[in-house]
Amino acid sequence: MGDDLMRTRHGFMITAAVCTVMFMSTACTGPGEIDPSAVADVTPTPGTSEEAMPTDGAAEAADKVSAIMVQPIHDAQVVFGSDEMNHVEYELLVVNVFSDPVTLTGVTIIGADGEELGKVEGDTLAAATQSLYTHAPSPVVDASAAVSVDIDLALPTGDVPERVTHRIDYTLPDVPGAVIVDDHVVHGPEVAVDTGEAIVIAPPVAGDGWLTTSACCSPNVHRDLRLSANGLRIETAETFAVDWALVKGDRVYDGDGSSNEQFYDFGAEVLAVADGTVVAVNDGVEESIPFTSKPPETKQGFGGNQVILEIAPGVFAAYAHLQPGSITVGVGDDVEVGDVLAKLGNTGPSQGPHLHFGLLDKPDLFTGRSLPFVHEAFTVVGTVDFAALTGDELVIAPESRELTEAYPLYGVIVNFPDQ
């Protein structure tokens, strides 16, 4: 099992986009340490007594009071994207330990030799700074609150850095308590980069005109999903997961979209992306009516009807929102790449028919960690501007680029070759 899996490595402009959510996805379903040697020198605050400050050179080694604490949620992951850039993906957990709101003003990513690799600021920083669950972008961190800064560091093909560090700038309001804060800069944290090779898989659907309505790497409901696992860690189960919808012309459905049958992808065959074994199946969830998704009554219902395959040790392929009664496999069945597993549907919390697909390090849509992958080959035929979406018609910039061993980024339309 998994012998046919291939792996590849490509070598690494900072990118992000204002979070725009396509109607398809409502909720589709290591911390590091701050390096104390890297912090800036203490400058005594005017009005502070000499007795309270270190003397005789001890100030250089003293800890300093900061209004925030910053840690990485995980090591960084790398994927070669359809823009032909290497995307380094990770999240910085920022906790406000001050009595008033703190405003983040800049996150600079720094390489091992001190070179600046990228900087997140302004509107880009605002879009990338998300509350931990509610997907509310803002650079302001409320008192005693925590946010995640989602980093998408896109670098040209070349060597992938094994580690990066940061300079994080922030401001405080003019309040009396601010005098205890020694510096408005955090130097760090350091983040390890997982330079392992991305898994190469076949596509989960076939044919032309497939649009990624949610995917890595700019802000969207997949990239921004975070859940607590066992109360001990934050997991990112959908960073690289893709929601696939079929486009014809500039639309994803015919008519007014009031029925599932009007969607071009409804009933499309869902395919095994590699040889593997079925480890989980959920069926019996009824189809939703487009644009009227309701929260499920059970945890299992969040993915609607599902199939999960183990395609390699510690690598699980998850398919969700499948048509009821269409699943052709059962737990324990062995499958080969290209086998039909089910039909594309609209079950679970979904605003319209689509396929949710992703790789995980365990067979759990909530506490598994999303794994990067690339498809063997596809052609990018357009990119959708979701920010310009005002009605049923998509705003598409046409293009034609053939790619091998690449990941389809958020908003691209691709054609898959015949298998």
Which residues does each PLM region occupy?
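Terminal connector regions
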Residues: 154-199
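Asparagine-centered strand-capping/turn motif at beta-strand->loop junctions
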Residues: 94-98
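Zn2+-dependent peptidoglycan hydrolase active-site motif and core
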Residues: 264, 277-323
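Intrinsically disordered, low-complexity Pro/Gly/Ser/Thr-rich segments with frequent PxxP/GP/PP motifs
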Residues: 118-160
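Bacterial signal peptide processing site
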Residues: 29-32
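C-terminal motif of bacterial Sec signal peptides marking the signal peptidase cleavage site
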Residues: 24-27
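Acidic, glycine-rich catalytic/binding loops that coordinate metals and/or anionic ligands
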Residues: 194-206, 211-213, 221-225, 297-301, ...
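Short histidine-centered loop motifs in beta-beta connectors
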Residues: 271, 311, 315-338
